[in-house]
Amino acid sequence: MKILLSKQQTRKIAIVSETHGLVFRPINSKNSRRSTCAVELVPKAELNGNGFRRLSNHEIYGFIGLIEIEGLMFIATITGKSKVAQPIPNKTVNKIYAVDFFCLNNSKWDFMDIDSSGYPIVTNDGDFAISSPPSISTHSSRSSLRSSSSRSLNAQEQAPKHPCHELRKLLSNGSFYYSTDFDLTCTLQKRGFTEHSLSFDDFDREFMWNSFLMDEIITYRDRLDVTAKELLDQRGFLTTVIRGFAETIFSYINRLKVGLTIISRQSWKRAGTRFNARGIDDDGHVANFVETEMIMYSSQYCYAFTQIRGSLPIFWEQDTSLISPKIQITRSVEATQPTFDEHFIRLFKKYGPVHIINLLSTKSSEIQLSRRYKEQLKNSEKMKIGRDVFLTSFDFHRETSQDGFAAASRIIPKIRNTILDAGYFSYDVKEGRLISEQDGVFRTNCLDCLDRTNLIQQTISLAVFKLFLEDFRLVKPSSFIDDNEFVQKVNALWADNGDQISQIYTGTNALKSSYSRKGKMSFSGALSDATKSVSRMYINNFVDKGKQQNIDTLLGKLPHQQVVELYDPICEYVNERLLESEEKFTTHSNINLFVGTFNVNGNSRRADLSKWLFPIGDKFKPDVVVLGLQEVIELTAGSILNADYTKSSFWETMVTDCLNQYEEKYLLLRVEQMSSLLILFFARSDRAYNIKEVGGSTKKTGFGGITGNKGAVAIRFDYGATSFCFVNTHLSAGASNIDERRNDYNNIYRNITFPRSKTIPHHDSLFWLGDLNYRITLTNDEVRRELRAQKDGYIDRLLQYDQLTQEINEGVVFQGFKEPTLQFRPTYKYDYGTDNYDTSEKARTPSWTDRIIYKGENLHPLAYSDAPLKISDHKPVYAAYRANVKFVDEKEKLNLVEKLYAEYKNTHPEALTTGPDELSHARMEKQKESIPLDATVQSAGIKLIDLDDTSSCVSPLLSGPSPQPSVVGPGGLSNVSPDKSKLNVLPPPPPTSRHNKEPSSKLLSPTKEISIVSVSPRKGESNLPALERHSTPKPLPPVPALSLSKPVSLQKSSSELQHAKETIDNGKIVPRPCPPIRRKSSTAPDEISTSTKNSGVSTTEDPEPAKASTKPEKPPVVKKPHYLSVAANKLNTSQEHSIKVSPSNSKSEEELPCKKKSKPKVPAKNPELEKLSVHPLKPCDPN
């Protein structure tokens, strides 16, 4: 494809395929604050005569969406790619190494190349480099063009950095992949071997990283008719991008040539860098969730096995500001349970039974996570251990501490039953029939789900792959050794996969990759791991914040970030009617809030908090409780540098016990601690389901931002469709330090950042509470005299000299904040255990240091007072509010939208599309003088002339002869091949593969090898590599549905099973391996297995009886067979076949029983299959 620009009448940009063009033009919409553009799918011929010309020399390999940056709309395209994988014949996977963003509503960036720093390339004389078509003989990549030009300082100052530069860097870093003929978002088992449509209806949006960019385009597509949808899907206009890893290597198993592929897909739902994305979110999505699939394809069989990884599905975080980041669990067991269950229900529906492999250490730093993990599993009423989920704890560090990483294979005996019961996906290529399906999945995790997880997933994958090879008698059990070439290549693939996942999450390659690649750990490998660890520490503290910002921008998760809206007359009508009918899908409700602040002065003794939390008993029961505590640890140098985070647990327990003394139960939804500051967020159990997007943040301001004795901890959440933010602060002390407190406030207000880059101003309701340390500016004697006299109006007289009241009234700080009427005595400073103000030598002036102020039109204060507690030198303060919150019924809103669309179409029949030639709502006016789009033009000169003839720029010189200008003359576009079939522009050469040293990879072919070429084929050329051209059948017919009513019998004679099928290849008889004989399999384990060092014994915990009513609903799944056999002469299906394992050897095997499964029907043979040529194999050895 190519990208064209026209400035006739209105500015338009078109992405043009061989037959159609997708035309975009900006729209100034009066009824929408969002950036809006119109899109039209038109036949290519309609672009003639509309002034279109090439906007870029680079071939467009895919359109990946629209995005708004800094008020500008950009069209995102793939302009550089290399072919890296071929999981099955005719299906290729490409790595993205270059993208371009073309501005739709501004001409500033037209015809410009951008350098690696994001600035336009300029020549030595200061002119900007204008893109010009290279000559046919030129194979220079974009980097060579840029290296031939230099930017002058003056020119750089004139031209700003490209707004999409950071996104270009992110998308071009080698971790993004796409395919034009293969659905990368689904596993091979789900996709199947039928002629699979690349329809967006079939894609798994969880792995589609350009989902935000394509959101409106997909909506536009869904409203088209079937013909138009097929055009968009099949012509490359809609491209799905995944992030992860994909690579294929080729090897031989005995004499059978095979392609070995690993594809990893990372979910974008909770995407981010290591310390910015931990645990689970409110929708049940976990950080670093990756689905990894290993595929083997040969001319005889296809095999696939899928595993998943993901962060522990509980709410936990780590403080990046510490050298040894502390693990903090931020939500209680009860509050976490619904989200925890939702996560596993989703996995169960998608993969079947889930076997958890927990690799966390039993050391104190990780043991709390393991304990919480098991507690959540046991408390689940929807997922039952031993039925839906299975847990194996394997302390990786302890198991490998003595015998090295080879001891990781000890995991296999512990999970053998699940390996046999879940099976693997296998397909008979020759006969075009499904043999087995995987039913179940291993979910592996460590702390980061990287290094330990990589090694265990590799170990499990090799064990299952060995099982497949033995079952299909492609290798003998004794011949499968680690020195085999294909085993070494598989190990190298897994090492590359681990490095790529680690690069995405941490910015460095994986630890232990030296062992993964070579099977042994050398001194250089250990030194490399130490270097990576130091690099990770630097990246975590100085780089990850910017990377997280770029990821959130790409995914549309920044505050108030919206998709580029596609103009649609119907959409305009619907939006107007939605505003008028908002009350039909929107409801409002009042909730009660209780907010408290207390400087506890390091107190660690239990006390009754009822007078603070329930000042009027059970007459007021809040829906939400937020408490801010200060000085939960003593403010000494030692305690500040080594904060005791166990104090948070002490206060959590004491507050929870007090809140739950009545019938209503409260759940802890968030705790945030920074040194001596702590904020607790509780909600009533029957209200917790309304709360989403809970997040926390901290900011240090003590000693210039170094220590946490002063600063802020904050939490935010959404209650329905209303957002709340609470900031608990401890500002600088001292009556004269007003400027320091102003600086603290501004520093906190600007720098508190929640997940997805939300900040304090982005919320509907704000609360600022804590020990604000504002004083009364009268003398100590004057204040105490007023407090002793208690004359009428003494509180108001003292408030006139209150620094905070003065600051708010002057608008210096806390702009827009209000404080309820203050009618209580100063809360600081008291003698401990009394109601007497400070009698020490310092004799502090009594002041209202402890305050609660608010901001929000939906807030109505009900009460504001102190509480008579005597456990600190401060008095606790509380405030009660009634908040009006909004709820949006999304289902009702969607129903209303559909009704409005139907209503509009009934009253405006002209808005309906009538066929493939009228695919858009409004056509551009077609000029009478139609100029052929592909006409050849002969022109001279080196200038690119603007269509409006207002400017001209000199094109940069390329290697070889001077390029011809890209001017639209009477003949149309230049740089077109003589046969008018394709533009004569060659893309940059792809990078050399890591495994195949030659410039082109050797493809899977039994008889011939042909190189992989990343350049799109020209018309008339074949796009099929060797395997497709010589040994691959045409797309196989659909596999018939399996039926439980007709169990498949395997009662075949020994001679039938041992007799090799024959195929004819050029007159030669080529025997095939015997089909595998299945084994019996035992059921999955009904226990929680916990590894014991140097032991294969598992401790068993009896699960509770299963509750049928609480079992998660799973779509009807027909059990598919998987054949697991070791000996062809064991034909009695009732007999238990087994593999013997010696517990003393990590490579040996215990008895692995299998259970019977059904066998699918065999469809009629495809005559094309008989044309396959395969390598000759010896007849099967029954022994």
Swiss-Prot record:
Dephosphorylates a number of phosphatidylinositols (PIs) like phosphatidylinositol 4,5-bisphosphate (PtdIns(4,5)P2), but also phosphatidylinositol 3-phosphate (PtdIns(3)P), phosphatidylinositol 4-phosphate (PtdIns(4)P), and phosphatidylinositol 3,5-bisphosphate (PtdIns(3,5)P2). Controls the cellular levels and subcellular distribution of phosphatidylinositol 3-phosphate and phosphatidylinositol 4,5-bisphosphate. Specifically functions within the early endocytic pathway and actin organization. Changing D771A: Impairs completely enzyme activity. The modification Phosphoserine is found at S152, S522, S1005, S1016, S1095. Pfam families: Exo_endo_phos2, Syja_N. This is Polyphosphatidylinositol phosphatase INP52. Residues 1046-1057, 1082-1100, 1130-1145 have a biased composition (Polar residues). GO terms for cellular component: actin cortical patch; cytoplasm; mating projection tip; membrane. Residues 133-161, 955-1183 are annotated as: Disordered. One of its GO terms (biological process) is protein transport. Its main location: cytoplasm. The keyword Ligase does not apply. It is found in: Cytoplasm, Cytoskeleton, Actin patch.
